[in-house]
Amino acid sequence: MDKKTSRLRRAIRARKKIQELGVNRLVVHRTPRHIYAQVINPEAQVVAAASTVEKAVKEQLKSTGNVDAAKAVGKFIAERAIEKGVTTVAFDRSGFKYHGRVAALADAAREAGLQF
């Protein structure tokens, strides 16, 4: 089993547990160049989204693949989710380690007002 398959298996296991809770989830995906975040409701509809690909986010950054970029995305996703009336979420790290950019995004979202 390779690294990606292991990560996807962890992600599926976590998503099943979140699905049983029936709450909104903050999903994070990262690539070496970008980081993406979405708030998805229990009916699997995207409520809010933010990423380093977006022009509004990218203009504020020097680089899109670092911790500062993840913090910016965390702040944007929290603002957009709260704007739509979502304040409480479950954090879905998609099988990635809670470390570095993933942790930075989560901390920034918490500071901006999301609860998880």
UniProtKB/Swiss-Prot annotation:
Keyword Thylakoid: no
Single GO BP term: translation
Keywords carried by this UniProt record: Ribonucleoprotein, Ribosomal protein, RNA-binding, rRNA-binding
Gene Ontology MF term list: 5S rRNA binding; structural constituent of ribosome
GO cellular component terms attached to this protein's record: cytosolic large ribosomal subunit
SUPFAM superfamilies named among the record's database cross-references: Translational machinery components
Record note on quaternary structure: Part of the 50S ribosomal subunit; part of the 5S rRNA/L5/L18/L25 subcomplex. Contacts the 5S and 23S rRNAs.
Protein function: This is one of the proteins that bind and probably mediate the attachment of the 5S RNA into the large ribosomal subunit, where it forms part of the central protuberance.
UniProt similarity note: Belongs to the universal ribosomal protein uL18 family.
Annotated PANTHER family: 39S RIBOSOMAL PROTEIN L18, MITOCHONDRIAL (PTHR12899), LARGE RIBOSOMAL SUBUNIT PROTEIN UL18M (PTHR12899:SF3)
The name this protein goes by in its record: Large ribosomal subunit protein uL18
Organism per entry: Shewanella sp. (strain ANA-3)
